[in-house]
């Protein structure tokens, strides 16, 4: 971890160090980000449960006594069709940048640095945000064409972040090293794009529970209006269907549980029948996965009308240590000391 997770200044604009130094040996940098600006690159590291203890109970690295209580094995949810080759992992890296080539460069070099000690189990390249994380951002759209993440936690909501995202030292005696960090839920969700595209607009909006254009709840108002789940139409039926995604996923319907989503859309080409392999790479930071994510996803998997158009194919849960100073220290240092 010290070798790959210590802050460096190679992302500074104009720095060519490593990519062109030396002639006889392999370069210390792969070089595809030469001449590119840092592009607001961020790198987030997570630790999987298997790093601490395997499913068979083997303590490979002497870390079992520091396994966080909340770093659980996510249950199998109804309808899951998980690919083991796209699930789990000892470590996780989320690299984000305004330029995808800069993000790929970061991951590529981490894999190069880790050669011989770690190898890539699976990866996913995403594009475009699927949730706004700041009040200054507009709500983006997912590949179904709807605004996604309207009720997402925002960076300016410090009290909410403290309550729902950041781990407190008192949360777990065995995981004091994780204080100031979080837990990352990762789910690769394939979308049946072609089926969705043949669905009427009225049905699409009923499935989501919001208007497609403005993103307003079907109970009325603008995008950020509080959904009125008790409101009914002239036929006596709820304006927001009880099987809609909004009804089942909104914090008001989940005992106030909120998530900080930071996911992305993805397309991985098409299959032999010309169908897009596309969807949502769902990424959410939470303080307590068993309380905030599992109950909500159980309800969605069981009752969400949108499940007809989705297939969960990959899954993971990771403990995300707090960040490090600009100089000195490395990610996860408190765990390994």
List PLM regions with ranges.
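Long, histidine/aromatic-enriched segments associated with O2/redox biology
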Residues: 2-337
């Amino acid at each position: 971890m010290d070798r790959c997770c210590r802050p460096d200044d190679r992302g500074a604009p104009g720095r060519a160090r490593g990519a062109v130094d030396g002639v006889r040996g392999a370069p210390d940098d792969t070089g595809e980000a030469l001449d590119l600006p840092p592009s607001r690159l961020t790198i987030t590291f997570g630790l999987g449960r298997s790093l601490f203890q395997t499913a068979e109970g083997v303590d490979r690295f002497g870390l079992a006594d520091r396994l966080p209580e909340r770093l659980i094995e996510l249950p199998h949810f109804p309808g899951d069709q998980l690919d083991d080759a796209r699930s789990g992992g000892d470590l996780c890296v989320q690299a984000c940048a305004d330029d995808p080539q800069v993000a790929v460069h970061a991951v590529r070099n981490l894999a190069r640095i880790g050669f011989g000690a770690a190898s890539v189990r699976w990866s996913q390249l995403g594009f475009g945000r699927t949730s706004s994380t700041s009040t200054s951002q507009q709500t983006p759209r997912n590949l179904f064409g709807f605004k996604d993440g309207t009720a997402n936690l925002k960076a300016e909501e410090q009290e909410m972040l403290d309550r729902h995202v950041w781990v407190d030292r008192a949360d777990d005696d065995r995981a004091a090293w994780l204080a100031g960090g979080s837990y990352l839920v990762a789910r690769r969700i394939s979308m049946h794009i072609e089926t969705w595209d043949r669905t009427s607009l009225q049905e699409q909006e009923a499935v989501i529970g919001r208007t497609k254009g403005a993103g307003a709840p079907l109970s009325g108002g603008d995008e950020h209006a509080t959904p009125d789940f008790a409101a009914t139409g002239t036929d006596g039926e709820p304006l927001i269907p009880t099987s809609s995604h909004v009804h089942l996923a909104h914090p008001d319907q989940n005992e106030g549980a909120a998530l900080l989503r930071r996911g992305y859309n993805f397309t991985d080409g098409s299959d032999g029948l010309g169908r897009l392999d596309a969807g949502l790479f769902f990424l959410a930071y939470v303080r307590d996965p068993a309380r905030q994510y599992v109950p909500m996803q159980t309800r969605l998997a069981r009752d969400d009308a949108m499940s007809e158009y989705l297939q969960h194919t990959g899954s993971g849960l990771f403990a995300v240590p707090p960040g490090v100073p600009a100089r000195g220290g490395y990610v996860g240092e408190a765990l390994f000391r």
